[in-house]
């Protein structure tokens, strides 16, 4: 009984893996209360923000569903990664992916060390809002899917593959490093392809020298044979020795040719080698990189052209600004001279008009006096010449003359008022026009000053 108890003990470190084994081996499934149902989602292409290395939870509705899982809550992400293809099917799962964890309002990438620590219960309530598991299939610049954990697993497998008994090398570490470096610098591909035949030739030369040294040792060993054998079989040994030397030389020449041919084959068939499944993608990646370089060169040329055009336009703008400033100063000087000329004329005419106005007022006063005297004389004459019949007073000539003089006086006064009103109106119109022109000039000056200040701030 003690032995059975010891056998049934489960180690603490491998508890999640043991639970998976028990689930797969035991026909009786555990109760549903011990399992957790998780909905698995994929992040679609183009939605992941590679600059910020995160994505908002508001875009979760656009994620692609891959199915759901019923697993133990104590299972770690590392163990789930190994068995995820069995739960959901290999077709529904990407070859290489990353787990995502909801923290706050964003999704964060789970690193390799955290995969062995995080358990699936942290992705279900009450630890999470929704029982959902998010996967991110990551694409490199050559179009291959990769993730930090799977790259490390590949390196471990390649290290183990080198030491296999069959002697077949699946994928050495240098190849993975070569692929990583080739994405950064495409010129490495040409250099490595050129160096491969040289290395193979050196190896072939080394093998040939080793075979020659072995032949020399055999010859020395054969020369140390007993004298009886040398005497008895001298002729036969000489012929055999010469034949062996010729055969060895032929073998070394053939081996050299074969090594060179194998090196050339490796040089030619390097992209189609079965141990490098990503080699066909390298050509497409190189073409993409070359296209990117050509596009970059085009963009750089366009940038240079735009800079030259900008400089040319800036020079033209500066010249135009200078010409505008000169024209503005010239127009300002013209206006100033015109203003001064009109001001002088106005003062001179004002001096003249003052004396003329005095003369005019005197003449008006004299005219009024003459008009009053004339009316008094006509009225006195009318009284003297008044007939006895009052009905004929309106028909007299004197009365008509009085009316004519009164009407003429009224007409003269109206003319004077009209002339004064005309003068006032003309002055007001001129003043208004002058005010409008001054306002326009002030506006243009203000706009120019604003432009100059803006340009000064920009510089």
UniProtKB/Swiss-Prot annotation:
Transmembrane segments: none annotated. It comes from the Eukaryota. Pfam families: SPATA1_C. Residues 193-213 are annotated as: Disordered. GO terms for cellular component: acrosomal vesicle. Residues 193-205 have a biased composition (Basic and acidic residues). InterPro entries: SPAT1 (IPR039062), SPATA1_C (IPR031478). Residues 287-374, 400-453 form a coiled coil. The keyword Transferase does not apply. It is found in: Cytoplasmic vesicle, Secretory vesicle, Acrosome. The keyword Coiled coil applies. Keywords: Coiled coil, Cytoplasmic vesicle. Interacts with IFT20. This is Spermatogenesis-associated protein 1. It comes from Homo sapiens. The lineage of its organism: Eukaryota, Metazoa, Chordata, Craniata, Vertebrata. The gene is SPATA1.
